[in-house]
Amino acid sequence: MNFFQAIFLGLVQALTEYLPVSSSAHIRIIGDLMLGSDPGAAFTAIIQIGTELAVILYFRHDIIRILGAWFGSLFGKEGKDFKSRMGAHNRDTQMGWFIIIGTLPILIAGLLFKDAIESTLRNLWITVTVLIIFGILLWVVDARAKQVKTMDEMTWKDALIFGIGQMLALIPGVSRSGGTITFGRAMGYTREAAVRVSFLMAIPAVFGAGILEAVSAVKDVAAGNAGMFPGWGATIAATIVAFVVGYVVIIGFLKFVSTFSYKAFAIYRIALAVVVALLLICGVLHPTEVVAAA
């Protein structure tokens, strides 16, 4: 992978990360078409840090408020009882705990099934299958679910269900936002509330994965096993592109969901799956990673 190819993949990451279409699937598919090989889980995870930095910038006021309330409940002089520490009297404190709860499923699954996530689950036939399944689920759930619940009505149970939706995004094709939004809409959350929860809940998970993969990439490069990794210069540049373009996409996506349904995204997922299946059948794409020179 050369510098410009890495930059292009950073752009793809930014355009697809927040939409319920699976950025990891797009990176996997376009990487195969462009490079003849999977760009790899390490490169994908690291450039996702760029899009999450855009989320932090956009939601900075919410994040500062939530962190302030959460740390205040733990170390502040007031509210020493257990219920206060858990956010019984402060929604921001509670949201901090909800984000932690929602992060646990993907953290546990990511550690337990790391090898499968980085190999078996990146098979493009699996990607095709889940693109279709979650496309249909998103379409049906969004069309039939009520829009009554806001973020202020979230419960511990809801946070865990959101987290399970995020956990499923470890499979390329599910989509982190697609999983959480689908589960959120199924619980009756408004489209905008489901999106906001999806954005906030992804921050610790994506940063954690990015840092772990960065450490792993450093070890691989030092050992001479870089594979398709384009080098740190290209990877950092791709991450910056993902950050800048990603910020613009966040603004547009939030405006979109306040007016329109997710039907267009569901149709796109299904159409993409059909195209990828045809390319696999014709031998243009490879279902599993092909060893190629960096």
UniProtKB/Swiss-Prot annotation:
Cell compartments where the protein resides: Cell membrane
Coiled coil: none
An annotated GO cellular component: plasma membrane
Keyword line: Antibiotic resistance, Cell membrane, Cell shape, Cell wall biogenesis/degradation, Hydrolase, Membrane, Peptidoglycan synthesis, Transmembrane, Transmembrane helix
InterPro entries in UniProt: UppP (IPR003824)
Disulfide bonds: none
Broad EC category: hydrolase
E.C. no: 3.6.1.27
Positions of transmembrane segments: 39-59, 93-113, 123-143, 197-217, 234-254, 265-285
Alphabetical GO biological process terms: cell wall organization; peptidoglycan biosynthetic process; regulation of cell shape; response to antibiotic
Membrane topology recorded in Swiss-Prot or TrEMBL: Multi-pass membrane protein
Catalytic activity: di-trans,octa-cis-undecaprenyl diphosphate + H2O = di-trans,octa-cis-undecaprenyl phosphate + phosphate + H(+)
Other observations noted: Bacitracin is thought to be involved in the inhibition of peptidoglycan synthesis by sequestering undecaprenyl diphosphate, thereby reducing the pool of lipid carrier available.
Function: Catalyzes the dephosphorylation of undecaprenyl diphosphate (UPP). Confers resistance to bacitracin.
Similarity comment text for this entry: Belongs to the UppP family.
PANTHER family reported for this sequence: UNDECAPRENYL-DIPHOSPHATASE
Protein name in UniProt: Undecaprenyl-diphosphatase
Organism: Bifidobacterium adolescentis (strain ATCC 15703 / DSM 20083 / NCTC 11814 / E194a)
